[in-house]
Amino acid sequence: MADYVANHLPEDGVPLWDYDLPDSETPYRDSSAGAVTAAGLYTLARCYGPGEHGDTYTALADKMLLGLIENCDITNDNDAEGLLKDGAAFVELGRANNLLPYGDYYYLEALMRSVGHTEFFW
């Protein structure tokens, strides 16, 4: 699954809401998917440890986290009601470009894991 993500991730590091959309679909970003995936990749990398797979998954998690920081983080907005913009819960029902609490949670978890925290937070 991690390799699939690596092969379908846009250059900016923020996944599209379905990772592999047909050209006819609007390419909404999904920051919540990026946050969940980045947190999971840090965990996967830790399971593998140093070496080819661990280093590859850490680099992918870093790319995704940097993409979220640069493109979706709204923590400098005093009026923001969340941490990340551009969450996509159910695009077909118009639930795109949203703030999603679970995206914020996993964003915080990914940030913590990126600096070495390894305890689960839930």
Where would I find each of the regions flagged by the language model?
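Glycan-recognition and catalytic cores of secretory/periplasmic carbohydrate-active enzymes
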Residues: M1-W122
